[in-house]
């Protein structure tokens, strides 16, 4: 059972920002933001044609500045948010804005990646998440499964909840909270939990993970020294409401139960340098992706702490032949393991993410502008499904 070869797409600029087009559930589409100091920055809309194993692309100009983070609206295919650097009077400020892509590009196109006649189009600015008083924005996260009207931005030591007005033409600050403590505390990453009616957000600052209740903007849990060095990213298990994964500069990936934060449930130590990105599969939460500046992407099978630790159990009533019953998967917990290590990158991998339209497909992005699309090995896919 031979697996498909990875598909590689090269951007002409350096890049570190990647997101799936979250609201698109039919086509496989990713958005990539570039980092160039000399030239106009771009957002590449990457369409993956699964049947023919080829990439089609469109390019949007992002003239506001180099892109450090990108996120897509969960409700509107055409809307996205970027965090970007703006230089004024030799001062660099990290800003955030919400944009709309041209209508005809929301559902992709069939332009060849090598078409020299293709011209870049511009984004329409919908609103700034004006944070001049709060500091530099690290990331913008959308309320999951929402109507695309609520976002949170993390700016230095502030967590800011915004309400986007109709057609996203204005962002109104609904509430905020500030990190308290010694020293220069700054947020590095955040994720909005899909559980608890979307009322919880987790943030990373230095080596600490914190949970926040968005209704009161108060802290609900705190995991101090979650990592030995800076925490780079985190993600919520989509199927187990108290489970959270984090990664950091100590080369580790840790899994937490937020009801008991004294120690991690599990720790992975497969990378040899900083781990920049961790992502749970949206459907099969035992599949966990990580990307690191050791230039590798690792796909792990964390089945023992997943929502199906015994595999896919079949109800006795579904089995007509008792002989078949013995052929069913055993009721013993399955073993955690590294499924595959992907080594198509030659530079630091800053972002990994799953496609929103296909649970078996994922993309990774390294700083040299190389985007790689890979699939979960077929043997494992059928093992999970059957």
UniProtKB/Swiss-Prot annotation:
Modification type N-acetylmethionine: residues: 1
Residue list for modification Phosphoserine: 320
WD repeats: 132-172, 182-222, 226-266, 270-310, 344-384
InterPro entries listed in its UniProt record: EIPR1 (IPR040323), WD40/YVTN_repeat-like_dom_sf (IPR015943), WD40_repeat_CS (IPR019775), WD40_rpt (IPR001680)
Superkingdom of origin: Eukaryota
UniProtKB keywords: Acetylation, Golgi apparatus, Phosphoprotein, Repeat, WD repeat
Annotated Pfam families: Beta-prop_EIPR1, WD40
Main location: Golgi
Subcellular location(s) of the protein: Golgi apparatus, trans-Golgi network
Complex formation: Interacts with two multisubunit tethering complexes: EARP composed of VPS50, VPS51, VPS52 and VPS53 subunits and GARP complex composed of VPS51, VPS52, VPS53 and VPS54 subunits. Interacts with SNAP29.
Name the UniProt record assigns to this protein: EARP and GARP complex-interacting protein 1
Gene field: Eipr1
């Amino acid at each position: 059972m031979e697996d498909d070869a990875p598909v590689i797409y090269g951007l002409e600029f350096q890049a570190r920002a990647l997101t799936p087009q979250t609201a698109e559930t039919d086509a496989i589409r990713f958005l990539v933001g570039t980092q160039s100091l000399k030239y106009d920055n771009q957002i590449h809309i990457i369409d993956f044609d699964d049947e023919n194993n080829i990439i089609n692309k469109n390019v949007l100009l992002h003239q506001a500045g180099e892109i450090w983070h990108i996120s897509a609206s969960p409700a509107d295919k055409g809307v996205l948010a970027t965090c970007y650097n703006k230089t004024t009077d030799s001062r660099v400020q990290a800003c955030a804005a919400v944009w709309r892509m041209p209508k005809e590009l929301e559902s992709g196109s069939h332009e060849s990646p090598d078409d020299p006649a293709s011209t870049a189009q511009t984004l329409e600015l919908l609103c700034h998440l004006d944070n001049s008083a709060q500091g530099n924005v690290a990331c913008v996260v959308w309320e999951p499964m929402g109507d695309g009207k609520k976002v949170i931005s993390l700016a230095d030591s502030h967590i800011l909840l915004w309400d986007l007005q109709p057609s996203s033409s204005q962002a109104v600050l609904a509430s905020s909270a500030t990190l308290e403590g010694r020293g220069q505390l700054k947020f590095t990453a955040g994720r909005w939990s899909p559980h608890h009616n979307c009322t919880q957000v987790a943030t990373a600052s230095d080596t600490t993970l914190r949970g926040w209740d968005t209704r009161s903007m108060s802290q609900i849990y705190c995991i101090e020294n979650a990592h030995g060095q800076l925490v780079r990213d985190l993600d919520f298990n989509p199927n187990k409401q108290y489970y959270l994964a984090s990664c950091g500069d100590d080369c580790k990936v840790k899994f937490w139960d937020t009801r008991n934060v004294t120690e991690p449930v599990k720790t992975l130590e497969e990378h040899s340098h900083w781990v920049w990105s961790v992502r749970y599969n949206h459907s099969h939460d035992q599949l966990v992706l990580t990307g690191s500046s050791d230039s590798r992407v690792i796909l792990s099978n964390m089945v023992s702490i997943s929502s199906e630790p015994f595999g896919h159990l079949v109800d006795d009533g579904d089995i007509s032949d008792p002989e078949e019953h013995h052929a069913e998967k055993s009721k013993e917990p399955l073993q955690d393991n590294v499924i595959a290590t992907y080594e198509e990158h030659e530079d630091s991998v800053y972002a990994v993410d799953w496609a929103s339209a296909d649970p078996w497909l994922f993309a990774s992005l390294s700083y040299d502008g190389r985007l790689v699309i890979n699939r979960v090995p077929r043997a494992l896919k059928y093992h999970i499904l059957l």
